[in-house]
Amino acid sequence: MKNNVEKKHHPRLLGEYLSCSRGSIRVAMQKKHEAKALGNKQKRIGEILVELDVIKEEDLRNALRQQRADRIGLCPVFESLSRTELIGIGNYFSEVSLTADNQFIFEGKNDPTLYILVGGKLEVFTKDHDGNEIHIAFVNPIEPIGEMGYFQDGIKTASVRTVIPTELLSSGYKNLTHYFEHVPHVAHAFLSVINRRQAETIQRIKEAENQH
């Protein structure tokens, strides 16, 4: 399948998908920073722009749809999908924002969810029999997270936490089964990621054992 997504090292910001001035975006960002300083619940830039009547709800939905498709297309697992397929699969994903030092995947817990890291930084880790943490890897955008639980009935095989404020896309495994099992390029890429992550985990655990 032809990939029509323009490859960039970093995903594009939402403002690049909206037909509004940079000044309007700066005002929205200022309001977001003010809310943070006051300890109030922070809204997304798009929501603030709608409240300011700079854009319409429909404009925001369309921009998010296009941004989501681009971000998913930058993920190694889904980069072979066409533009139409990326927009389609994007309907199953939603945006998640997390603060720094926030553990959101817990080893041994049932969480049938695939995440895509689109901004920020994550740490993957496990624990030995004594409860000591074993660092496995740091993960940077754009990479899938939580994929190894797919073949474990949703049980996570490692823990993951944010290192800095992080943006993710998330979707339930059940929404992605068709792509993982019936789209060859996606299935191959998905298995490649799993094999690489398994090798990293085994290597880190061996290194930790050798240090004792």
Give residue spans per PLM region.
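Short hydrophobic beta-strand motif reused across regulatory alpha/beta modules
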Residues: 49, 54-55, 117, 122, ...
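Regulatory nucleotide-sensing modules
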Residues: 73-125, 144
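A short beta-strand-loop-beta hairpin characteristic of the jelly-roll/cupin
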Residues: 122-134
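A short, compositionally biased micro-patch
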Residues: 109, 117, 129, 153, ...
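Cyclic-nucleotide recognition modules
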Residues: 134-191
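A small-molecule sensor/coupling module
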Residues: 68-69, 82-88, 156, 174-212
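Non-catalytic accessory regions
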Residues: 1-87, 211
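Residues that scaffold the ATP/ADP-binding catalytic core of kinase and kinase-like folds
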Residues: 58, 89, 125, 147-148, ...
